[in-house]
Each structure stands twice: as structure tokens, then as C-alpha cells.
Amino acid sequence: MKKHILLISGFLLSFCFSTTIFAQEKTKIKIERAGFFEKDKNKYPDASVLTRDKEQKVLISHDGVLMTCNQAFFYEEKNFIEAFGEVSLKQGDTLNLKANYLEYNGDTKLVYAEGNVILNEPESNLYTESLYFDRNKQEAFYSEKGKLIRNLSDTIYSLKGTFFANEKKYRFETNVDLRTPKYNIYSDILNYFTESGKSYFSGPTDIITDDSKIYCEFGYYDTMNDNGYFIKNSEIDFEEYQINGDSIYFDR
């Protein structure tokens, strides 16, 4: 049995939650379905063990989310779940988190997912090895490399990233690489909106196409309409000439 409760606590501290979160009324995690139920105080003094049967997975609900898995350890007194094997956490019709292993705290609404993690929303899929998700803030965070695929056209790699679910926006940091069929963008920080495909970058940024190289330190690029606006030390190098300026509008 894994122990990531301390990781959840660390996540809590790192995101600087206010005490008002804990003053809110807490709802209990509910076990909707389990094929087998085991309660052994000697083997698992604080937990009930829930296991799927041949036909259906374990089903768990809490305040607008549904979780399914092959097996779960339910710590009722702590309002806490450890889920194992083909884990899925669904929030409404817009967000689905899949992993090999997941922890969920019903009091703080914090989620930790690990192993083949996929975060799906209508416009994109994020792939990483571990992910924290704060349901109060509707923010998810990873720090062990991630890959985002949007509409099979835009692919973004980075070492760190944060997803803001309410804005449908990702903030990618460190070794950011946005790839499309027509160009690549390399930047330190890139804000990317999954609905529109618009990307906003800051810091030294290179945009490479088949016939040009663009450099700037601030700006945006619209991946849907293939145009952009570049500010601060902007430069476009074509094969036969170069354009420099404080601000450059670019439309292919």
C-alpha cells in the first residue's frame, strides 16, 4: 500500500491555501459500488479495502466527481481514498483524469495522480507521470515533464506546467517546445489557450518555419490563423532579407 499522504500535505503548503477553505462544510466520500468489501483491523487498521468484481469497477463519488478503479483503500475517518489500477476521476462532462494510482482527500479536495497520467478536456490531452489537482482552485500542476496534444495538430512539451481549468489555459515553463505542422516555437514560458489555440510567450523565444526564423522576447502566436505579434528585440530572418523592430506583426 502506497503512502503519499505527505505529498498531498506538501502540495497543500506549496499552493498556500487560506484557512477559509477548511472552514467550509466538508462532505463525506461515498462508496457507490464495490464487488468485494474487506475490513481487517490487523492488516489494514484504518482502511476498508474495496475491490472490483468481474463485471464492474469500484465506483466512488464526492461533491461532483466520480471515481472508478480496480481497488481502493478507503480511510473513512480521514475522508481519504487511495485508488489503484485503471483509475479514472471525472468532473462533469469537461474533465477526466486517468492514472495507475490516485489519492483523493475529501476534506481538502486535493488529488494526486501517478503513473501514465492523462488529463483530458474537450480540446486536449495532457500526458505526464505525476500530477496534482486542486479542485477548489480548479488548477492542475506537474513538474516531471509533460506533453500536451491539441486536436492532433499542436503538440507542446515542457518540464513544468499548470492547467487553469476555468480559463482553459495552460502555463508551460522550462524548455517549452510547441510543435505544429508548419513551425516550432521554443520559449521559457508559454501560456496556451486550448479553445483558441493562441499562445502567449515571454522571455527569449524562437519561432522556426521552413523559410524563416523569428526571435522576440514577448508576444503571441495564433496557431489556428497562423499569425502573430512580436514585441521587444523582435527579428525575422528570411532567406534573402531580415526585418527588425520593436514590434512586428506577422501573417503567413
Summary of predicted features, one role per range:
Residues 1-9:
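Bacterial N-terminal signal peptides that target proteins for export
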Residues 9-16:
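Bacterial N-terminal signal peptides
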Residues 22-252:
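N-terminal amphipathic/hydrophobic interface segments
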